[in-house]
From Swiss-Prot:
The glycine cleavage system catalyzes the degradation of glycine. The P protein binds the alpha-amino group of glycine through its pyridoxal phosphate cofactor; CO(2) is released and the remaining methylamine moiety is then transferred to the lipoamide cofactor of the H protein. Gene3D superfamilies: Aspartate Aminotransferase, domain 1, Type I PLP-dependent aspartate aminotransferase-like (Major domain). The gene is gcvPA. GO terms for molecular function: glycine dehydrogenase (decarboxylating) activity. It comes from the Bacteria. The glycine cleavage system is composed of four proteins: P, T, L and H. In this organism, the P 'protein' is a heterodimer of two subunits. The keyword Oxidoreductase applies. Keywords: Oxidoreductase. SUPFAM superfamilies: PLP-dependent transferases. This is Probable glycine dehydrogenase (decarboxylating) subunit 1. It catalyses: N(6)-[(R)-lipoyl]-L-lysyl-[glycine-cleavage complex H protein] + glycine + H(+) = N(6)-[(R)-S(8)-aminomethyldihydrolipoyl]-L-lysyl-[glycine-cleavage complex H protein] + CO2. Its EC number is 1.4.4.2. Belongs to the GcvP family. N-terminal subunit subfamily.
């Protein structure tokens, strides 16, 4: 039977079978033992209308975050994304292009990635940024490897207040290669204590704001770093309000770019931010897009300094990162362009205000903050012992509550990490408070 979406006619199929010397399509599978064959148990075909109706019924079983009040942060955040972002980013011109190796036919994608790099530099206060990494965690691990290449040392001190899953990825990358990972503790403010730094330390890695939401004192961190390089893990939206790490002398800035227009799809897809000083550019992993002029004198863009193992000997490569998250970076570029500096600053301001209002209301109910340091849009507070069970109950009420922390930080006891972004309303907060009673 012929279908309009199948290119081969019955005559085409007969001609091909005759050419290869078999009488039917079934004969192509005759070598498969009968014992290995089974029915596919596929129902009879349906018309398009029936298929869409059935798929809609199945999809309605899923929970949509649009219906939930989300107080869950910890690295992935619910934010509002203007519709124009995906109208532009999902254009076939961008979606169908793979890696822009052939610069002469990829100028649109290359320019968008160049603009992404420029905006990341403006946000972080750094001199050069690459065209993206896989995610924030692997970007941190690559930063540590870069610090070893730059210093010739083999030890990194990472703050315990860095995202616990980032630290796990860091250890996975480093320890089997013989590198040393040492964790630095934190004080009652929630800020890092750097007592483990010595002359053998290649780099210090801290998060700003840290996993607890606390804004680290980068002046203190820089003063304690000695000759070690300073790696700062950032939440990019916060940098619209906070001083950029580059202004404190950070050597490498990495982070998760999901906040810049990407959805919360099961924790991804995500985007690794990576920026550094220009003098370190030849040790920077990943792809870098550069601007130049062509033979006619017109501005043009191309990939430069391709020191990946696809292009040079593995032993000399700075990274084995292959297909990076270029389209995610493009979405981030469109989002930052649409929002502009003022819009991004307003998103950060509203997130800060919502989180501090939530904190005040929780304290009014008797909940105590765990740390005294200033926070951005997340904070840790004490919760009842039965909170993990209550968290599940809140989900049934369409509330994604603050994250229980006991599994990540046993020393903190019964605590939770609360988050509020610009999409959280006072009504959402009251809904959470009612559930917390």
């Amino acid at each position: 039977m012929n279908y309009p979406y199948i290119p081969h006619t019955d005559e085409d199929i007969r001609a091909m079978l005759e050419f290869i010397g078999v009488s039917s399509i079934e004969d192509l599978f005759s070598s498969i033992p009968v014992s290995a064959r089974s029915s596919l148990n596929i129902p009879e075909s349906r018309d398009e209308f029936s298929v869409f109706k059935r798929l809609k019924e199945i999809s309605e079983v899923n929970a949509s975050l649009e219906d939930y009040a989300v107080f869950l942060g910890a690295g992935v955040y619910k934010r509002y994304v203007p519709t124009v972002v995906y109208d532009l980013a999902m254009k076939p011109d961008f979606l169908t292009a793979y890696t822009p190796y052939q610069a002469e036919v990829s100028q649109g994608t290359l320019q968008a990635l160049f603009e992404y790099q420029t905006m990341v530099c403006e946000l972080t206060g750094m001199e050069v940024a690459n065209a993206s990494m896989y995610d924030g965690a692997t970007a941190l691990a690559e930063a540590a490897l870069m610090s070893f290449r730059l210093t010739g040392k083999e030890k990194v001190v990472v703050a315990r207040s860095v995202h616990p899953e980032y630290r796990a990825v860091l250890r996975t990358y480093l320890e089997k290669r013989g590198f040393t990972v040492v964790e630095a503790g934190y004080d009652e403010t929630g800020r890092v204590l750097l007592e483990e730094v010595d002359e053998e330390t290649a780099a210090i890695a801290i998060q700003y704001p840290n996993f607890f939401g606390i804004i680290e004192d980068l002046d203190y961190v820089r003063s304690r770093s000695g000759n070690a390089l300073l790696i700062v893990v950032v939440e990019p939206v916060s940098l619209a309000l906070l001083e950029p790490p580059g202004s404190y002398g950070a050597d490498i800035v990495v982070g998760e770019g999901q906040s810049l227009g990407l959805p919360m799809w099961f924790g991804g897809y995500s985007l690794g931010i990576f920026a550094t000083k220009e003098k370190y550019v030849r040790q920077m992993p990943g792809r870098l897009i550069g601007q130049t002029v062509d033979q006619d004198g017109s501005v043009t863009y191309t990939m430069i300094l391709q020191t990946r193992e696809q292009h040079i000997r593995r032993a000399r490569a700075t990274s084995n990162i292959c297909s990076n998250h270029a389209h995610a970076a493009l979405i981030a570029a469109v989002y930052m362009s649409v929002m502009g500096p003022d819009g991004l600053r307003e998103v950060a301001r509203r997130s800060y205000s919502a989180a501090h209002y939530l904190q005040e209301r929780l304290e009014d109910m008797g909940f105590k903050l765990c740390f005294s340091g200033e926070f951005f849009s997340e904070f840790v507070f004490n919760v009842p012992e039965d909170y993990p069970e209550r968290w599940k109950w809140m989900m049934a009420k369409k509330i994604l509550g603050p994250l229980p922390l006991k599994g990540f930080y046993p020393e903190l006891g019964d605590t939770a990490l609360a988050c509020a972004t610009e999409v959280i309303s006072k009504e959402d907060i009251e809904k959470l408070l009612e559930a917390m009673k």
